[in-house]
Amino acid sequence: MLFSIVVPVYNVEKYLQECLDSIIKQILQMSEACEIILVDDGSTDSSGKICDRYKTMYPDIIRVFHNSNHGLLMTRRFGYKKAKGEYIVNCDSDDLLELDFFKTLVKTIREYSRPDMIIFNQYLYDGWNKKVAFDNILSEKDVSVVPKQDVLRQFLMGNSLVSICGATYKRTCIDINKDYSMYAHVSNGEDSLQKIELFDHADTFVYLNKALYNYRMGSGMTTKFDANYYSSFKVVFKEIIRRKEKWSLSDFEYLLSIKVLSTVGRAITQTRLKKWKNYKDHKKYLQRIREDDILTEYIENVDMIKRQIQKSHLIFLILLKKYLYCMIIVLLNLKNLSEKIGMEK
């Protein structure tokens, strides 16, 4: 069996059928054996029934499992344990695969001697229109064999390689017996955690400078405040720091500074999405981040990596370095006010 497509499912009745159709239509046209693993994580809408209906329609392709609120990370890991394919494909249940997704991957697997990981671009999709999220990530060529060190550097420098859905990889790259229950509380950064594991075991990489996956916009930190955003990513930082010697990157500290400070910039920015009871509570939240041991070390490098940081984030980081919480809060409130006035016009 060539591909196992793992689809975590939770309360996505509005999008699930479209997602599954984008996968099944391609599989039915393939000569290679594939399976779809649907893991329903205790959905309270009709998602579970939709999974069962598709299982009845395509019994030779689909396997369905019903679990009870294990969270996205553990649900995905459960799917991995059930997988039988040589390669793993991840597809979130509200997203879509491009029409030539599998055709392109099969061609790449054959022509490049079955690489450990194939990385590809993604579209941002709003249900009607789509645009490329990132391109030329690892090369400007259409297809490239990429050194592992280049992949690791890009992973640390930005978000373009974070998504677990932006690559297919051999099942042997997964440490299937690793206990992820200690990370079950992680509300953000679960993709990064798993990518770190994959990078540990993958040696050969091919990059396709082509968008094969459609990520549906409308959820996540752009619309919702998560009080555990930074603490979740701190788990990721610790895992990366543990691999400093193993990864052998000459500019490791520089790259990790970018990773840490970019994350803090986002953590600060998203605080404006919360209706704080008072200034004191908002300040305490910022203060906890500022006093964190990892940030205390890496915020000293803000001047060194300033060209790699989003300008709006850089301003907040400079203020945070100087403990100017009041200034940060004022700027965030002004941003909210500006947007409100713009919407009323």
What is the predicted role of each segment?
Residues 2-4, 35, 193:
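Cell-envelope/extracellular polymer assembly enzymes that use nucleotide-activated donors
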Residues 12-27:
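Short, well-formed alpha-helical segments that are part of the catalytic scaffolds
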Residues 22, 40-49, 70, 92:
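A conserved acidic beta->alpha catalytic loop
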Residues 67-83, 90:
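Glycine-rich, basic loop-to-helix element that forms the pyrophosphate-binding segment
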Residues 210-218, 224-254, 258, 262-297:
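Catalytic core of nucleotide-sugar-dependent glycosyltransferases
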